[in-house]
């Protein structure tokens, strides 16, 4: 561990928000992941920008995470700095405009909490996101979606930090949002906050829809187990979960990793899974589905760290 780098990071944020060899299993929804060389929590844009600058000066790799809900991190961990933005980053704002209402939230906000704040303002158009795990920044990064809605349907703009620490404001077109993809991924930007264009609605109807979607998730998804959400992207013309089920892989296990019996599109951690287990299972599922149906499944989960390529 480099004491000079450690001290620089502690000078940027308070000492208690910098740790060394932090187990990333504590910060991912999969409950899997080895240690980060340096783990830093930021609360302000200025802190995040300063950490980026520090990493650039020392040629350190930087990974920014939100709630860690779409990540599989190597058992060997992450070299360099892992930066996590806290929930309250940059707050929550609502302003009226000619087109409707603009709602802005910080990247570190819990996505479901952000959706409920919107519902409490009697604004409609964001109900689909209420049960999606993760942070707002992660949702924008991945163009998250569920039950017929996705981020690109309602986003107006997002502010990002470049790898050089420059702040950019990108409109909907500039974000280049498509299925689980964005310019943010392609350029390696870091989300600061995002603004959405929404409309007034009936609060009772909005809350009822959220409740219905959350119940559907509970009924259909293995929420009782750690996972990274949907493991595979939806192949054109197919559903990944059905292909996996039809291939006879329901309940298929490698070590502590298992294809969920409740929803075959999810790989779950039954208690002691390693990244190696999950990666082997992903390999097996992709191979068998390809052999049986000629369809190549692509991971939706971000595979990060040493020796994590499927």
Swiss-Prot record:
GO biological process assignments: cell division; cell wall organization; peptidoglycan biosynthetic process; regulation of cell shape
PROSITE patterns per record: FAD_PCMH
Broadest EC class assigned to this enzyme: oxidoreductase
Pathway given in the UniProt record: Cell wall biogenesis; peptidoglycan biosynthesis
Gene3D superfamilies named in the record: 3.30.465.10, UDP-N-acetylenolpyruvoylglucosamine reductase, C-terminal domain, Uridine Diphospho-n-acetylenolpyruvylglucosamine Reductase, domain 2
Pfam families, A to Z: FAD_binding_4 (PF01565), MurB_C (PF02873)
EC number(s) per entry: 1.3.1.98
Location of the active site: 180, 230, 300
Cofactor(s) listed: FAD
Subcellular location: Cytoplasm
Entry GO MF terms: FAD binding; UDP-N-acetylmuramate dehydrogenase activity
Protein origin, superkingdom: Bacteria
Family as reported in the entry's similarity comment: Belongs to the MurB family.
PANTHER family linked: UDP-N-ACETYLENOLPYRUVOYLGLUCOSAMINE REDUCTASE (PTHR21071:SF4)
Entry function: Cell wall formation.
Protein name: UDP-N-acetylenolpyruvoylglucosamine reductase
The species this protein was found in: Lachnoclostridium phytofermentans (strain ATCC 700394 / DSM 18823 / ISDg) (Clostridium phytofermentans)
């Amino acid at each position: 561990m480099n004491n000079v780098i450690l001290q620089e990071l502690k000078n940027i944020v308070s000492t208690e928000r910098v740790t060394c060899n932090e187990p990333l299993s504590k910060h991912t929804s999969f409950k899997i992941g080895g240690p980060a060389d340096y783990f830093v929590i930021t609360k302000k844009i200025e802190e995040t920008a300063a950490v980026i600058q520090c990493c650039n000066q020392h040629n350190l790799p930087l990974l920014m995470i939100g709630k860690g809900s779409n990540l599989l991190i190597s058992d060997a961990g992450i070299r360099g700095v892992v930066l996590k933005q806290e929930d309250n980053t940059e707050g929550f704002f609502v302003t009226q405009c000619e087109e409707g209402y603009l709602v802005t939230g910080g990247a570190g906000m819990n996505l479901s909490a952000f959706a409920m704040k919107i519902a409490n303002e009697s604004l409609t158009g964001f109900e689909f996101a209420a049960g999606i795990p993760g942070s707002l920044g992660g949702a924008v990064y991945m163009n998250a979606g569920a039950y017929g809605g996705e981020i690109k349907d309602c986003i107006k703009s997002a502010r990002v930090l470049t790898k050089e620490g420059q702040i950019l404001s990108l409109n909907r077109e500039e974000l280049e949002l498509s299925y689980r993809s964005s310019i943010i991924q392609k350029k390696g930007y870091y989300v600061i906050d995002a603004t959405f264009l929404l409309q007034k609605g009936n609060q009772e109807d909005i809350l009822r829809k959220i409740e219905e979607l959350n119940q559907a998730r509970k009924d259909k998804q293995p929420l009782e187990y750690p996972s990274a959400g949907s493991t595979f992207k939806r192949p054109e013309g197919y559903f990944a979960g059905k292909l996996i089920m039809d291939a006879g892989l329901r309940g298929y296990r490698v070590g502590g990793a298992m294809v969920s019996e409740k929803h075959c599109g999810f790989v779950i951690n039954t208690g002691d899974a390693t990244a190696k287990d999950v990666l082997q299972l992903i390999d097996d599922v992709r191979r068998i589905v390809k052999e049986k149906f000629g369809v190549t499944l692509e991971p939706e989960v971000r595979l990060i760290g040493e020796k994590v390529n499927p």
